[in-house]
């Protein structure tokens, strides 16, 4: 642990089109090899497509999708006397968002549509309706935590 002062978190600049910090973070998650403009094009195209299909506002769809993918508990490995236990722990809000975004992008990359924008739009629509691969991932994590509830007293 550092003995000096705790370094504060950097302020993230909101994205240029919708002026949303959440969307700016999502763009950074999508971005590969530092190609931010490409990531922005993909996200904006995906949001436009999803908005057309569902008939709702862009940010409402994104927020609904992320809400349905955010985990509330996860398991962490903890060694106790030679054996390793999967201990269920609550997820901090910042990590919840990060995991939700990461899972949404991973699920979109595995889909079969032609372009990444269409894949992401499809996954966001699925997630906003509480179905799809990203939501399944969240359910699996929650199920794992529920199964290991007996080890909750090992929490640290």
Curated annotation (Swiss-Prot):
One of the GO biological process terms: translation
Domain of life the protein comes from: Bacteria
Keyword Endoplasmic reticulum appears in the UniProt entry: no
Q: Has keyword Lyase?
A: no
TM regions (residue ranges): none
Which Pfam families does its entry note?
A: Ribosomal_S7
GO function term, MF aspect, one: structural constituent of ribosome
Name the keywords, alphabetized: Ribonucleoprotein, Ribosomal protein, RNA-binding, rRNA-binding, tRNA-binding
InterPro entries according to UniProt: Ribosomal_uS7, Ribosomal_uS7_bac/org-type, Ribosomal_uS7_CS, Ribosomal_uS7_dom, Ribosomal_uS7_dom_sf
| Family in the record | Belongs to the universal ribosomal protein uS7 family.
What is the recorded function of this protein according to its Swiss-Prot or TrEMBL entry?
A: One of the primary rRNA binding proteins, it binds directly to 16S rRNA where it nucleates assembly of the head domain of the 30S subunit. Is located at the subunit interface close to the decoding center, probably blocks exit of the E-site tRNA.
Summarize the subunit comment: Part of the 30S ribosomal subunit. Contacts proteins S9 and S11.
Give the protein name, as stated in the record: Small ribosomal subunit protein uS7
Native source organism of the sequence: Shewanella piezotolerans (strain WP3 / JCM 13877)
């Amino acid at each position: 642990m550092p003995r000096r002062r705790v370094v504060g978190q950097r302020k993230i600049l909101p994205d240029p089109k919708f002026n949303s910090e959440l969307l700016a973070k999502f763009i950074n998650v999508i971005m590969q090899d530092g190609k931010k403009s490409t990531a922005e094009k993909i996200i904006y195209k995906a949001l436009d497509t999803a908005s057309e299909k569902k008939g709702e506002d862009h940010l409402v769809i994104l927020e609904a999708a992320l809400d349905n993918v955010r985990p509330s508990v996860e398991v962490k490995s903890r060694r106790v006397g030679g054996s390793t236990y999967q201990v269920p722990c609550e997820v901090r809000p910042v990590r919840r968002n990060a995991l939700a975004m990461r899972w949404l992008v991973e699920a979109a990359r595995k889909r079969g549509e032609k372009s990444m924008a269409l894949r992401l739009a499809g996954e966001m629509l699925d997630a906003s309706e509480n179905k799809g691969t990203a939501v399944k991932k969240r359910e699996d994590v929650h199920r794992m935590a529920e199964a290991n509830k007996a080890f909750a007293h090992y929490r640290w």
